[in-house]
């Protein structure tokens, strides 16, 4: 573990040196280069109640001190109407063993009436709360819609409308346990390439993913007086064919869609943020490691096939002065399918953000996560956590 941590730190330091070197060479390159970053450590006391198959409660509690995965360094580069952004994070909080994470890498062209973005960035429907538990999780997996970052082509117009074409998702029939599934007879030379959906090797039995279009998001962002708001729709479609002994044994067509809306109301010194969504097969659309198991398409003959999700969250903020801000919020999401129990979950938090200096913040927080019941009707864990985020940024 120590060796891996050192590698993370060395990568972040290396990225900082690269940014600094580019900054020193700005005159020769005729570029505007702005490095930035944030280093975050969290200390938490976490207590959980979980259940055995008989439904009896069990308990555990622990203290942790660790680097947050969303610690990052990056730089912005601009030349005329073109700009770019590159950002590296310490690690993916849901996949630490993968090491240093590319958080963002994209270029933008400002063509006057709007901007064209090409690269790797968060999904347009991401809208976060101020919750810091789970590496600034912001209700991740609890009605927040955060699903990571994807290769995309995004057109944003000055009138507020945007269209994003993104890498499509291809979750297997086992749901959350089969994310990013390739066609199994793609061949060793292609299994880890962007073309791993295409069959290239004969097998008597295989699973074939047929993809036809990018994940597509159409939305709008606007402002009216004290209200900043947005919303839109997203969709994804693919097929899964299963073959055994040269005979097709299954064919599933998976349609996923999402409708979302959010708003922020500035009532200084108060502010209100709200977000809501409804979806079909949301897990297949987003492929989120934090998604509820009940949000995925299922071909189980004992139940329906499509999962239906609705959820949302609300947050109240108060600015006491230029050093102290306070936030509290609650989230709820329900995932339903005919013939089974609803897979619901909720979360709540309250925190205080204190700016010790311009570049140093501490954020104490209390958080509560309740997984309620699974799609199988069994009781799931409840988590109580209190802790502090220690953040230095530049």
Task: Name each model feature, range by range.
Residues 61-71, 99-103, 146-151, 210-216, ...:
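Residues that define the transmembrane beta-barrel architecture of outer-membrane proteins
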Residues 48-59, 170-208, 238-254, 282-307, ...:
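Solvent-exposed loop segments that connect transmembrane elements
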Residues 82-94, 116-118, 138, 163-167, ...:
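Transmembrane beta-strand segments that form the barrel wall of outer-membrane beta-barrel proteins
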Residues 31-46, 59-179, 212-214, 218-225, ...:
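Outer membrane beta-barrel
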Residues 354-356, 380-394:
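Outer-membrane beta-barrel "beta-signal"
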Residues 65-87, 219-235, 317-331, 364, ...:
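Surface-exposed extracellular loop regions of Gram-negative outer-membrane beta-barrel proteins
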Residues 222-347:
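Detector for outer-membrane/organellar transmembrane beta-barrel domains
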Residues 1-32, 188-190, 195:
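Cleavable N-terminal export/targeting peptides
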């Amino acid at each position: 573990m120590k060796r891996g941590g050192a590698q993370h730190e060395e990568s972040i330091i290396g990225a900082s040196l690269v940014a600094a070197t580019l900054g020193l060479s700005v005159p020769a390159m005729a570029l505007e280069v702005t490095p930035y970053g944030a280093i975050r450590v969290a200390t938490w006391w976490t207590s959980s109640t979980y259940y055995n198959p008989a439904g009896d409660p069990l308990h555990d509690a622990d203290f942790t001190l660790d680097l947050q995965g969303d610690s990052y360094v990056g730089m912005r580069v601009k030349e005329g109407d073109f700009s770019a952004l590159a950002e590296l994070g310490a690690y993916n909080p849901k996949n630490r063993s993968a090491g240093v994470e590319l958080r963002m890498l994209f270029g933008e062209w400002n063509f006057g009436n709007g901007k064209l973005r090409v690269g790797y960035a968060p999904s347009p429907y991401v809208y976060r709360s101020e919750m810091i538990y789970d590496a600034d999780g912001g209700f991740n997996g609890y009605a927040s819609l955060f699903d990571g970052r994807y290769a995309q082509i995004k057109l944003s117009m000055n009138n507020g409308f945007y269209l994003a074409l993104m890498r499509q998702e291809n979750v297997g029939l086992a749901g959350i346990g089969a994310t990013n599934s390739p066609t199994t007879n793609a061949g060793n030379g292609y299994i880890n390439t962007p073309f791993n959906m295409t069959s290239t090797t004969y097998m008597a039995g295989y699973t074939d993913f047929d993809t036809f279009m990018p994940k597509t998001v159409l939305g709008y962002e606007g402002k009216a007086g004290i209200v900043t708001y947005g919303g839109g729709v997203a969709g994804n479609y693919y097929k899964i064919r299963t073959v055994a002994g040269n005979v097709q044994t299954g064919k599933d067509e998976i349609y996923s869609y999402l409708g979302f809306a959010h708003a922020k109301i500035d009532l200084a010194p108060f502010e209100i943020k709200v977000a809501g969504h409804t979806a079909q097969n949301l897990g297949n659309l987003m492929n989120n490691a934090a998604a509820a198991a009940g949000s995925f398409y299922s071909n189980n003959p004992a139940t329906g096939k499509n999962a239906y999700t609705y959820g949302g969250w609300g947050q109240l903020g108060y600015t006491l002065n230029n050093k102290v801000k306070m936030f509290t919020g609650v989230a709820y999401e329900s995932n339903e399918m005919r013939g089974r129990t609803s897979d619901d979950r909720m979360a709540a938090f309250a925190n205080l953000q204190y700016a010790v200096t311009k570049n140093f913040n501490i954020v104490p927080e209390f958080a509560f996560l309740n997984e309620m019941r699974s799609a199988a009707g069994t009781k799931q864990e409840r988590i109580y956590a209190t802790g502090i985020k220690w953040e230095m940024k530049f």
